[in-house]
UniProtKB/Swiss-Prot annotation:
PANTHER family: ATP-DEPENDENT RNA HELICASE DBP3 (PTHR47958). This is DEAD-box ATP-dependent RNA helicase 34. The Q motif is unique to and characteristic of the DEAD box family of RNA helicases and controls ATP binding and hydrolysis. CDD domains: SF2_C_DEAD. Belongs to the DEAD box helicase family. DDX48/FAL1 subfamily. Residues 53-223 form the Helicase ATP-binding domain. It comes from Arabidopsis thaliana (Mouse-ear cress). Residues 234-392 form the Helicase C-terminal domain. The lineage of its organism: Eukaryota, Viridiplantae, Streptophyta, Embryophyta, Tracheophyta. PROSITE patterns: HELICASE_ATP_BIND_1 (PS51192), HELICASE_CTER (PS51194), Q_MOTIF (PS51195).
């Protein structure tokens, strides 16, 4: 079923007095940044950009929430390009992300939108040479996009100077502030100036995360979507009833023969399942690539580049790929396994239908998974229908 909302009718729980700005031209950006925005392919700001960009540019702390695929990463990049003082080669913005892939994507987006400004951004992520990080930081960069562990390591070494940092962005903050990364976030935060501007940007913001923001945000502007309104425009959602786990593979092969797939991502719940399914598909003469967190960074980068450049059309992945990766040609997302919790669902299926394009999400469901499917429907206030036999 298509998402119950279109972007024009999203209802935002927005701080009083924050009005949408319908044109980038009216946001007070300098001409070089504005040119970069239009060159990047935007014609008008998305709903979340209309509300969040100006408060960020005015120096307010901001909590911004919108569904996946509405330009949150670009919103970060635009803010970074506008805020930094290009004449000073000191780090002025830190963007922290939960995965290496998202941190790299953010760095690339900053460089693309800031192409006319001479902005220098660098991705500080694990899996790459510490020596290269140190050299790049010592030469001077305006913005750092990274994972918390590597960023804090660079701060401790003295290679990343924080005195000039004026903006901290926590991207996918629900994941960032979860149990695994919370302490690292606080380590970085304590090394920053006391008057630091903080922005949290995410597709989901559970109540306990919002409560935690009180510790390091001052009178934040809130731009929020209610959980029961957080459905996805332009994505048709279906399930396929499979009686047994071993029948999923045959079902997947059948879909290959029926559907017109531009590009697809197939999600599994474990790295072991990703490897098993990849081998099974290849042994049946299907051309697929795979991605999970155990792969070396260079291999992950190569796989990403092949998928982005359309050299690879089908990717089998674990949830390392579920957050924040902009591949705008993905037409289908297949949940070979139903995600372990409802909040992962929106991140997975948000890979299809990016920026208003139509997409299809198909969920393989055993009888024991039906409760989880119903939980997802309740969580997002949506209906996932059984896939019709004539879907092409």
């Amino acid at each position: 079923m298509e998402g119950t909302l279109d972007e024009e009718n999203l209802v935002f729980e927005t701080t009083k007095g924050i009005k949408p700005i319908k044109s980038f031209d009216d946001m007070g950006m300098n001409d070089k940044v504005l040119r970069g925005v239009y060159d990047y392919g935007y014609k008008k700001p998305s709903e979340i950009q209309q509300r969040a960009l100006v408060p960020i540019l005015k120096g307010r702390d901001v909590i911004a929430q919108a569904q996946s695929g509405t330009g949150k990463t670009s919103m970060i990049a635009i803010s970074v390009c506008q805020i930094v003082n290009i004449s000073s080669r000191k780090v002025q913005v830190l963007v922290l992300s939960p995965s290496r892939e998202l941190a790299s994507q953010t760095e690339k987006t900053i460089q693309a939108i800031g192409a006319h400004t001479n902005i220098q951004a660098h991705a500080c992520i694990g899996g790459k040479s510490i020596g290269e990080d140190i050299k790049k930081l010592e030469r001077g960069v305006h913005a750092v996009s990274g994972t918390p562990g590597r960023v804090y390591d660079m701060i401790k070494r003295g290679s990343l100077q924080t005195k000039a940092v004026k903006l901290l962005v926590l991207d996918e903050s629900d994941e960032m502030l979860s149990k695994g990364l919370k302490d690292q976030i606080y380590d970085v935060y304590r090394a920053l100036p006391h008057d630091i501007q903080v922005c949290l940007i995410s597709a989901t913001l559970p109540q306990e995360i919002l409560e935690m923001t009180e510790k390091f945000m001052t009178d934040p502007v809130r731009i929020l979507v209610k959980p029961d309104e957080l459905t996805l425009e332009g994505i048709k959602q279906y399930y396929v009833d499979v009686d047994k786990e071993e029948w999923k593979f045959d079902t997947l092969c059948d879909l290959y023969g029926r559907l017109t797939i531009n590009q697809a991502i197939i999600f599994c719940n474990t790295r072991q399942k990703v490897d098993w399914l990849t081998e099974k598909m290849r042994s049946s003469n299907f051309i697929v690539s795979s991605m999970h967190g155990d792969k070396r960074q260079k291999e992950r980068d190569d796989i990403m580049n092949q998928f982005r450049s359309f050299k690879s059309r089908v990717l089998i992945a674990s949830d390392v790929w579920a957050r924040g990766i902009d591949v705008q040609t993905v037409s289908h997302v297949i949940n070979y396994d139903i995600p372990n919790n409802p909040e992962l669902y929106i991140h997975r299926i948000g890979r299809a239908g990016r920026f208003g394009r139509e997409g299809v999400a198909i969920n393989f469901v055993k009888s024991s998974d039906m409760k989880d499917l119903k939980d997802i429907e309740r969580h997002y206030g949506t209906k996932i229908r059984e896939m019709p036999a004539d879907l092409v």
